[in-house]
From Swiss-Prot:
GO terms for biological process: translation. Its cofactor is pyridoxal 5'-phosphate. Its EC number is 2.5.1.73. This is O-phospho-L-seryl-tRNA:Cys-tRNA synthase 1. It holds the Pfam family SepSecS. Keywords: Protein biosynthesis, Pyridoxal phosphate, Transferase. It catalyses: O-phospho-L-seryl-tRNA(Cys) + hydrogen sulfide + H(+) = L-cysteinyl-tRNA(Cys) + phosphate. Homodimer. Interacts with SepRS. GO terms for molecular function: Sep-tRNA:Cys-tRNA synthase activity. Pyridoxal 5'-phosphate binds at residues 152-153, 257, 280-282. Converts O-phospho-L-seryl-tRNA(Cys) (Sep-tRNA(Cys)) to L-cysteinyl-tRNA(Cys) (Cys-tRNA(Cys)). It comes from Methanococcoides burtonii (strain DSM 6242 / NBRC 107633 / OCM 468 / ACE-M). HAMAP family: Sep_Cys_tRNA_synth (MF_01675). Belongs to the SepCysS family. The lineage of its organism: Archaea, Methanobacteriati, Methanobacteriota, Stenosarchaea group, Methanomicrobia.
Length: 459
């Protein structure tokens, strides 16, 4: 193991080098097709001559460095380079090298639109192969048609706006995300919550009971069922297949919220019994934000992806190819291209979900060796994201430590670990997703080291 490596130093030097290359790129952009001006050529040569020193610095792997500024007070983000990041909503959205390259190449505004031809719609563009990507996305989640959207929430919004009438009821879980509430409210609907059981699991029976309750009280069935496969509070797995059957039995459309599943584990919407599958690109598909996917069946495609029928009264203009719920096109640049660039890796990693769950359980088992530690999520774990409780261990230390709960953040940071909620020593969430086994072992040992340092018993 190369113990001479300084990750902060390397992160800063990498950014310095990348930014020098970007400065060269800007000179090339500003030059005429016939060549550079004398000033441009001189500046270009000056930057190139400095690259040798930067590469030499990178080769050292250690040394003195300063944080790298982008502009003004905007500094480089080096969390992923410097630390093992266990932040629960960032793990699945960590960009692949291919996605980072795509962001560099396609960061300019409407970069997807260089070759937009008739019929002038994002999902019809063939170069780059955005049209094919939409087909592949639908197949990836076991549905018939798909569209990219600016985050899962816009998928909820599109479905809610399409099928909910004012006063309609929508059944969600008591663990539903706030964006589901807002999507229903925006469409004029009313949320009714199906309660989880004593194990914080939503069952098919609970959903059926809530449907019956709504029917008795309103005389109508709910217009939609919208349920998370794994919730954001505990990341417990809910009876999504059973709920899919209930939806089919009652004839109610079912939206599967795959914000924490699509892109990290296998998902087949039609096998689940879903009419709509929504995923998050920036949460679980290694994509830049905002990005997501909405997929549906042929039965619902015409309604959800309906095109405008509006005609201008003076000009007679109409834009029939544009889809109403997406205001025409959705992701016109880096978010979409990052999603496309990561897609081969994302498809492959879903095949190894069992290994991610093994890593999660290995860490949690080691974590539970620390006396007073608890896991609040269902256990054994079925996901890489977990809610844990350290009230009986690290919070006891925090009560008398001069740094209070921040002592724990300090200890983790010293060991190159980030992403826990700063100052939290009671209940908090974390994710091991995407970590290597070496990182899992290091992470586990670090928690035990901290416990040992503060005389907390280790079993």
């Amino acid at each position: 193991m190369d113990e001479q490596m300084n990750k902060k130093y390397l992160a800063n030097k990498l950014f310095e080098t990348q930014f020098a290359l970007e400065d060269l790129r800007e000179i090339v952009r500003q030059s005429l097709p016939t060549g550079m001006s004398n000033d441009q050529s001189e500046h270009y040569d000056e930057i190139v001559s400095g690259l040798g020193g930067l590469l030499e610095d990178l080769g050292k792997k250690n040394g003195q460095t300063q944080p790298v500024k982008i502009v003004g007070d905007l500094m480089c983000r080096t969390r992923e380079e410097e630390f093992i990041n266990i932040q629960p909503i960032q793990a699945g959205g960590r960009l692949t090298p291919e996605a980072r390259k795509a962001v560099i190449a396609y960061g300019d505004g409407y970069s997807t639109c260089d070759n937009c031809r008739k019929p002038f719609r994002l999902d019809k563009i063939e170069k780059p192969s955005i049209s094919t990507f939409h087909t592949d996305l639908a197949e990836f989640v076991g549905m018939d048609q798909a569209r990219v959207v600016p985050g899962a929430r816009r998928g909820f919004q599109a479905v809610a706006s399409s099928i909910i009438e004012k006063g309609d009821t929508v059944v969600v879980s008591t663990f539903a995300h706030y964006t589901e509430f807002l999507a229903v409210e925006g469409a004029g609907g009313i949320v009714r919550e199906a309660p989880v059981n004593e194990h914080n699991i939503l069952t098919a029976e609970s959903v059926a009971h809530k449907i019956d309750e709504v029917k008795r009280e309103t005389g109508k069935l709910p217009a939609l069922i919208m349920i998370d496969h794994f919730d954001y509070l505990f990341c417990n797995e809910h009876d999504i297949y059973g709920i899919g059957k209930v939806a089919q039995e009652y004839g109610i459309p079912f939206l599967y919220n795959g914000a924490y599943t699509v892109g990290i584990m296998p998902v087949n919407g039609q096998k689940i019994g879903a009419d709509f599958v929504v995923g998050s690109g920036h949460k679980s598909m290694a994509s830049a934000a905002p990005s997501g996917v909405l997929a549906t069946t042929e039965e619902w495609a015409d309604k959800i992806f309906r095109t405008t029928q509006m005609v201008g009264d003076v000009t007679g203009r109409k834009f029939g190819i544009k889809e109403v719920e997406f205001l025409g096109c959705t992701l016109m640049g880096a978010p979409l291209l990052s999603m496309m660039a990561s897609f081969p890796h994302v498809k492959e990693r879903t095949k190894h979900w069992d290994e991610e769950v093994k890593k999660s359980n290995y860490f949690i088992n080691e974590f539970l060796r620390i006396e007073g530690n608890e896991v609040l999520s269902e256990f054994p774990r079925k996901h890489a994201l977990s809610k844990v409780d350290t009230t009986g261990s690290f919070d006891k230390v925090a009560k008398t430590h001069k740094r209070k709960g921040y002592f724990f953040s300090d200890e983790l940071k010293k060991r190159g670990i980030a992403g826990e909620f700063p100052g939290a020593t009671r209940s908090w969430k974390m994710s091991t997703y995407g970590l290597s086994w070496d990182q899992i072992h290091y992470l586990s040992n670090s928690f035990i080291e901290i416990a040992d340092k503060y005389d907390i018993n280790i079993n």
